[in-house]
Amino acid sequence: MRIREIEPIVLTSKEKGSATWASIMIVTRVITENGEVGYGEAVPTLRVISVYNAIKQVSKAYIGKEVEEVEKNYHEWYKQDFYLARSFESATAVSAIDIASWDIIGKELGAPIHKLLGGKTRDRVPVYANGWYQDCVTPEEFAEKAKDVVKMGYKALKFDPFGPYYDWIDERGLREAEERVKAVREAVGDNVDILIEHHGRFNANSAIMIAKRLEKYNPGFMEEPVHHEDVIGLRKYKASTHLRVALGERLISEKETAFYVEEGLVNILQPDLTNIGGVTVGRSVIKIAEANDVEVAFHNAFGSIQNAVEIQLSAVTQNLYLLENFYDWFPQWKRDLVYNETPVEGGHVKVPYKPGLGVSINEKIIEQLRAEPIPLDVIEEPVWVVKGTWKNYGV
């Protein structure tokens, strides 16, 4: 089936989410010449307009191509775009189109994506909670919300306890972070994993001080402890602590991912299918990780189409650690966008079996919330911060 049309669609609503980027989605609709429709999702962050335009540009390389030839199509664009391995916009655009292509292939063959990739290794995918700590500042606020998360059935939760600290952290920042982590650990007990998010914003010396301060609380991993591009700092960090490092959401190619894995710089790989290259590249990096005894925990923060495809890939990942889950903290419209999405039960989600993504798309929601691409405001609290947490407390 040849691709006839590719359309980027920006969705937004007055109902906001737990972070600035949560109020928007960039959906990509691919239509074949015989009318089959597939859906993908791209990453908005602060680059809504540029990503929207990138999808339009990348589409020119896909129109008229056989939708089933995902490997060939991806490498054709890799050949055309000299900067694909360095362009976030290009990478997320090609990822969205690739995901939609796999959705179509599954529908054509009457099988969910996990069956196309060799079949599932599990019926249920273990997940961890994120987005739950909106407006938490004091240790007590973190602890109370953490208890609520555990009551919902989650066996693991992630949070950023560092407030407004960036690059450097001082004794006050270390103390506040420790008090928050201690409060959460005491609230949830020792049988729930706590995962520490750094958002890749510290230099190596600060990250090492953080690790030494928090290691007593037995975190399951330390996510992006140093600035993404600071490979030297990451080596220094790895040599200074036994804590496991998780990273990968900002990796945008197979070879870049292979470097981090094969150099021993990561213990838990967090590829994001909406910017790594979709299912086509995603299936490759899973195997690279498995061959190097690295676990996988897909980054899964943006929208319900991403959530659907990453459940499918998690189902076939033998070396899966956990899947990130914002679903319970999505604005309602993101949940209404899909039918058949499976809820979290006992810290797991069931793997859906509908052809393609495993879910159906609510076309009415798309038409109701369709909007022109607009720039997001740049405010004091960065776009990646869970809202209301970019604060100190006390004196």
Swiss-Prot record:
Swiss-Prot/TrEMBL keywords: Carbohydrate metabolism, Lyase, Magnesium, Metal-binding
Thermal dependence: Optimum temperature is between 80 and 100 degrees Celsius. At 80 degrees Celsius, the dehydratase is stable for over 2 hours, but at 90 degrees Celsius its activity is decreased to less than 50% in 2 hours and its half-life diminishes to 120 minutes. At 100 degrees Celsius, the enzyme has a half-life of less than 40 minutes. The activity is almost undetectable below 60 degrees Celsius.
EC number(s) recorded for this UniProt protein: 4.2.1.140, 4.2.1.39, 4.2.1.6
Reactions catalysed, as given in the entry: D-gluconate = 2-dehydro-3-deoxy-D-gluconate + H2O; D-galactonate = 2-dehydro-3-deoxy-D-galactonate + H2O
Binding residues annotated for Mg(2+), in chain numbering: 197, 223, 249
Cofactor: Mg(2+); Co(2+); Mn(2+); Ni(2+)
pH-activity dependence text: Optimum pH is between 6.5 and 7.5.
Keyword Thylakoid: no
Record-marked site positions (Transition state stabilizer): 324
Residues at the active site: 199, 299
UniProt-listed Pfam families: MR_MLE_C, MR_MLE_N
Pathway in which this enzyme or protein is active: Carbohydrate acid metabolism; D-gluconate degradation
Entry similarity comment: Belongs to the mandelate racemase/muconate lactonizing enzyme family. GaD subfamily.
Further details from the record: D-gluconate dehydratase activity is lost after incubation with phosphatase, whereas no such decrease in activity is observed when the enzymes are incubated in the same reaction mixtures without phosphatase. Analysis of the amino acid sequence of D-gluconate dehydratase indicate the presence of several putative phosphorylation sites on serine, threonine and tyrosine residues.
Cross-referenced PANTHER family: D-GALACTONATE DEHYDRATASE, D-GALACTONATE DEHYDRATASE-RELATED
Name this protein carries in UniProt: D-gluconate/D-galactonate dehydratase
Annotated source species: Saccharolobus solfataricus (strain ATCC 35092 / DSM 1617 / JCM 11322 / P2) (Sulfolobus solfataricus)
Lineage per the UniProt record: Archaea, Thermoproteota, Thermoprotei, Sulfolobales, Sulfolobaceae
